[in-house]
Amino acid sequence: MSQEKKVFKTEWAGRSLTIETGQLAKQANGAVLVRYGDTVVLSTATASKEPRDGDFFPLTVNYEEKMYAAGKIPGGFKKREGRPGDDATLTARLIDRPIRPLFPKGYKHDVQIMNMVLSADPDCSPQMAAMIGSSMALSVSDIPFQGPIAGVNVGYIDGKYIINPTVEEKEVSRLDLEVAGHKDAVNMVEAGASEITEQEMLEAIFFGHEEIQRLVDFQQQIVDHIQPVKQEFIPAERDEALVERIKSLTEEKGLKETVLTFDKQQRDENLDNLKEEIVNEFIDEEDPENELLIKEVYAILNELVKEEVRRLIADEKIRPDGRKPDEIRQLDSEVGILPRTHGSGLFTRGQTQALSVLTLGALGDYQLIDGLGPEEEKRFMHHYNFPNFSVGETGPVRAPGRREIGHGALGERALKYIIPDTADFPYTIRIVSEVLESNGSSSQASICGSTLALMDAGVPIKAPVAGIAMGLVTREDSYTILTDIQGMEDALGDMDFKVAGTKEGITAIQMDIKIDGLTREIIEEALEQARRGRLEIMNHMLQTIDQPRTELSAYAPKVVTMTIKPDKIRDVIGPGGKKINEIIDETGVKLDIEQDGTIFIGAVDQAMINRAREIIEEITREAEVGQTYQATVKRIEKYGAFVGLFPGKDALLHISQISKNRIEKVEDVLKIGDTIEVKITEIDKQGRVNASHRALEE
């Protein structure tokens, strides 16, 4: 990498974009500093000197949010950054996906991309800056990379598309789209949307691609200026004679019939047996452990299986389980299968099954998100778990990984637009989707199961959501789009394009591909085929439950809303929170108070809610002119007595208002602790209350 500092500038969505090379992190294979507005990201690319064994490309993308970038000190005892949060993990995945397909086939060196956010401007996305930084770090390095790529964020407001919308614009946008690609095609899409049409989504994707092309041209100018010398990489050549011999054996032993097996586990077992039979043909009795030969035979066999699966789909239009390209697997769904939970839905599609379980909580049960932006209170959460047994495997049980975090977030994005507002449904909602069986499209099964759970719980959702995953097999001059892909089609195909939405439109999409990019024609056709599949699944789900239940579970907390004057909030809270804690301790409820005076009281028992409400009403109660009260004498003065009307409110009973008869001394008729009926005659501008007993005698 060049050791001389160089600075390159352009404009991006009305803000300055600067890329600097040659000054920082000079021992990395490639490093750039990206300045976008006041956002600053350091992106580095490093590769190992030797390749790794295995049949996968060991690429790792990291995205680190440094709290100092937003002028914050991390929370917790250690006061330093820990493991990446969910948002950072999702950003790392977002960057990985458009970059991964652009490395040479067969390249097995470890490659690590590091993105450090050094300064964060909320209106200048650090995520998009990191994507450009990752592309540039690879492009100016000696690592072989067929980029550059770029990514942009697209919003949709009042019928107009916007590149990299500000925080305020995102609040009113119907679309939150991240799209990435190179100059010729789109190769990554991620979006959440408020029921936009397929055509609107298509236009948004290619509106974003126009800006991507400009950014790629800018990066290419930098590469042409720096002229990095790339590592020489020569892919290993296949022994064609060996390939032909193995191919002949696979045909002889019935590879086609083995692939065309309905049951996933039976197919896997049959393929393993076929491979073992063929490998045994090559084992030399004098050298039975020739590992290099055995590895090569297995590698060729795996490639031949892939070629056969793709040939069957592309030429014969038949899939491994016998389906047609646009056919959906058998569907089954149930609700209310767990008696003590607040809502549950079981969704099964072929050999993929998800159990989604919903829990309702008080508003105070929200998740607090403390990242580089302002603190955020999240009242809807969707979590996804993928245990080993779901694919018939064993292994250690670990905390959720990148895949589980990503699938959970996709489901959350698909469903959040149908969740009712706090005013209509004052609850925190958490859904956990447990994948019990998996043969592809488990994330979309979790979305369908979650919709069932929401309706079973009685959540008044705006509309049901269903999800489906689309696949693709390309040939030189043709392509085949697949509806509802299974595991083998995902692994051996060219695309995993997930689409979720209501009957009216799309609420989320996510596209991953293994080829260079997709044309407008393919994306348009995939979206339309997904729409038809989504509606078919939706119709099945609505046969199980067609609308949310009218009542919540008996085990769900009840939430009652009441309103007080904003200036009374301090009375309910009390000094240092003393009063509100007393209410919570006495009644066992959860209290959430908004700045406008709205109070949410939550508890399982209605009696607890009623008692808490009574206490709050007593605290915030106000005297009214003309009302009568049974008052208690609290203090006596020469000019009258101060009486308590109710907790927190006293009134002056002047000596002239005690009786219609003349009184010389207050003590002649009243003493502290006496009860006397009074009528409120006046409340002055300072809120002081005057009362009269005499008015009741006349």
UniProtKB/Swiss-Prot annotation:
Domain S1 motif residue range list: 626-694
The source's domain of life comes to Bacteria
Cellular localization per UniProt:
Cytoplasm
Task: Write the Enzyme Commission number(s) for this entry.
Answer: 2.7.7.8
- Tell me if Cytoplasm is a UniProt keyword of this record: yes
For this UniProt record, the keywords arranged alphabetically read as follows: Cytoplasm, Magnesium, Metal-binding, Nucleotidyltransferase, RNA-binding, Transferase
GO MF, one term, reads: magnesium ion binding
Q: What Pfam families does this protein's entry cite?
A: KH_1 (PF00013), PNPase (PF03726), RNase_PH (PF01138), RNase_PH_C (PF03725), S1 (PF00575)
The record's function comment reads: Involved in mRNA degradation. Catalyzes the phosphorolysis of single-stranded polyribonucleotides processively in the 3'- to 5'-direction.
Q: What is this protein called?
A: Polyribonucleotide nucleotidyltransferase
Which organism is this protein's natural source? Staphylococcus aureus (strain bovine RF122 / ET3-1)
